[in-house]
């Protein structure tokens, strides 16, 4: 189960984008897309039905989920996330500080 959710602020901890920060756009089983990171050029065919033009499009490629860590808002460092039941509600908490993770919108 992925502990990183759409809208979370993350930092890349491995690979060519190491040290860069961004917001998670989408999460699949073991991969995440981060806004503005791991950009690739894709050759797009024109589509008559949708009216989309052809050409070379720059878009985000996915990163493996093990190469990113959630960014702790108070310490501005990479952190791990756990779950705790607080007042009968299961919430995500930072492992280092025990603070509740802000809900992504």
From Swiss-Prot:
Q: Which UniProt keywords apply?
A: Ribonucleoprotein, Ribosomal protein, RNA-binding, rRNA-binding
Question: Looking at the keywords, is Nucleus present?
Answer: no
InterPro entries for the chain = KOW, Rib_uL2_dom2, Ribosomal_uL24, Ribosomal_uL24_CS, Ribosomal_uL24_KOW, Translation_prot_SH3-like_sf
Recorded hits in SMART domains, A to Z, give:
KOW
- Can you provide one Gene Ontology molecular function annotated for this UniProt record? structural constituent of ribosome
Q: PROSITE patterns in the record, alphabetically?
A: RIBOSOMAL_L24
Q: Which GO terms describe its cellular component?
A: ribonucleoprotein complex; ribosome
What are the GO BP annotations of this UniProt entry? translation
Task of the protein: One of two assembly initiator proteins, it binds directly to the 5'-end of the 23S rRNA, where it nucleates assembly of the 50S subunit. One of the proteins that surrounds the polypeptide exit tunnel on the outside of the subunit.
Q: Give the UniProt family note.
A: Belongs to the universal ribosomal protein uL24 family.
User: What does the subunit section of this Swiss-Prot or TrEMBL entry state?
Assistant: Part of the 50S ribosomal subunit.
Its recorded name reads: Large ribosomal subunit protein uL24
Taxonomic lineage: Bacteria, Pseudomonadati, Pseudomonadota, Gammaproteobacteria, Moraxellales
């Amino acid at each position: 189960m992925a502990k990183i959710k759409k809208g979370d602020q993350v930092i890349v901890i491995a690979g060519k984008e190491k040290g860069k920060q961004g917001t998670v756009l989408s999460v699949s089983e073991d991969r995440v897309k981060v806004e503005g990171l791991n950009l690739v050029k894709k050759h797009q065919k024109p589509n008559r039905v949708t009216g989309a033009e052809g050409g070379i499009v720059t878009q985000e490629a996915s990163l493996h989920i093990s190469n990113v860590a959630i960014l702790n808002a108070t310490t501005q460092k990479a952190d791990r996330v756990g779950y705790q039941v607080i007042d009968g509600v299961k919430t995500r908490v930072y492992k280092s500080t025990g603070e509740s993770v802000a809900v992504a919108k």
